[in-house]
């Protein structure tokens, strides 16, 4: 029996404002925050009120459409100058998530040849809405392909939150859980809590429970033991950037899981849209890894848990080498084998369509 699965949208366009699901408040309260300026959009991304690579791209696109409505100029040259300034400004918010730059570049390109301000404003709004709609379709396709990798009753481990609230809908790594729910295929999620910001504990568990999908929360330290004792059948994660050879940047701790998957001989899948690929970089060594504030580690919900002055290393992401990845699940299919060749072939086909 098919089931319609609904989860609150992470980003909604209101015409003269953006409503974002404030993910820092989850799971205790479901609060929407209204953003009316480009500065508020930038801060919302930085503060992780909006997070997840596709959702960041979507809110950035809407942020640029919003800003363009407020430029105090009658000259298209000045309009373009202000717009490019705001594009560059938003790009400073989260350097690792390639979807951010993909969305910014797409918005910039959409009005490159436009000669009137009114037309530019209209096109920017339409392009942002198109980016959101396309992401929903892309995520559904990812879920359909991912579901072919699993069978009814499988236990699947994941980390962070690559779910519906990190995208337009469905998510990437969590998409097969939603598509499976709709099609009557039961998948049980094991969610790593994901220190230090607890995206797994706060967000993945919240949204899966909203959809009545089975989920079990574990500490990050428990992953190996869970694989060993809970009959984990596979691991699936999202991605913030995938380079030309398949090396993948994702939430810190992802590489740990890939190593465990290899040791225990279970599949390790990465689920991501083509917009997350950065084929201008050859290997993961070229990816800039964002380092976040030390208080994310030294404090938990505002309470100091480490001695003041303790040295902290707090990278937000790590790089999983391609040889640890069983397959990369995209909206166009599953990439396996020689990642450098297959990724190049896929993008060549895309360029010719």
Curated annotation (Swiss-Prot):
It catalyses: 5-(methylsulfanyl)-alpha-D-ribose 1-phosphate = 5-(methylsulfanyl)-D-ribulose 1-phosphate. It comes from the Bacteria. The record marks 160 as: Transition state stabilizer. The keyword Methyltransferase does not apply. The active site is at residue 240. Homodimer. Catalyzes the interconversion of methylthioribose-1-phosphate (MTR-1-P) into methylthioribulose-1-phosphate (MTRu-1-P). HAMAP family: Salvage_MtnA. Belongs to the EIF-2B alpha/beta/delta subunits family. MtnA subfamily. This is Methylthioribose-1-phosphate isomerase.
């Amino acid at each position: 029996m098919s089931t319609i699965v609904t989860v609150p949208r992470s980003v909604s366009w209101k015409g003269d404002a953006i409503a974002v699901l404030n993910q820092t408040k989850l799971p205790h309260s479901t609060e929407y925050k209204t953003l009316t300026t480009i500065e508020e959009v930038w801060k919302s991304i930085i503060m992780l009120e909006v997070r997840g690579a596709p959702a960041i791209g979507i809110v950035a696109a809407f942020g640029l459409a919003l800003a363009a409505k407020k430029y105090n100029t009658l000259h298209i040259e000045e309009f373009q100058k202000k717009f490019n300034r705001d594009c560059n400004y938003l790009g400073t918010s989260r350097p690792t998530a390639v979807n951010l730059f993909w969305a910014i570049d797409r918005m910039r390109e959409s009005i490159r040849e436009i000669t009137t301000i009114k037309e530019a404003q209209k096109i920017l709004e339409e392009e942002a809405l198109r980016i959101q709609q396309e992401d929903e379709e892309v995520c559904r396709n990812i879920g359909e392909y991912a579901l072919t990798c699993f069978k009814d009753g499988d236990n699947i481990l994941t980390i962070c939150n690559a779910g519906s609230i990190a995208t337009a809908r469905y998510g990437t790594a969590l998409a097969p859980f939603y598509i499976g729910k709709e099609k009557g295929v039961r998948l049980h999620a094991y969610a790593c809590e994901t220190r230090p910001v607890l995206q797994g504990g706060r967000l993945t568990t919240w949204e899966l429970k909203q959809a009545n999908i089975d989920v079990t929360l574990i500490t990050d330290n428990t992953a190996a033991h869970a694989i060993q004792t809970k009959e984990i059948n596979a691991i699936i994660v999202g991605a913030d950037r995938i380079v030309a050879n398949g090396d993948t940047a994702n939430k810190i701790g992802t590489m740990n899981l890939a190593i465990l998957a290899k040791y225990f001989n279970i599949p390790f899948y990465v689920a991501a849209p083509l917009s997350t690929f950065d084929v201008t970089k050859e290997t993961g060594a070229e990816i800039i890894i964002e380092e976040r504030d030390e208080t994310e580690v030294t404090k938990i919900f505002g309470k100091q848990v480490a001695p003041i002055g303790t040295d902290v290393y707090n990278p937000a992401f790590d790089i999983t080498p391609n040889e640890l990845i069983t397959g990369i699940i995209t909206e166009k299919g599953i990439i396996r084998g020689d990642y450098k060749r297959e990724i190049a072939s896929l993008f060549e086909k895309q360029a010719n369509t």
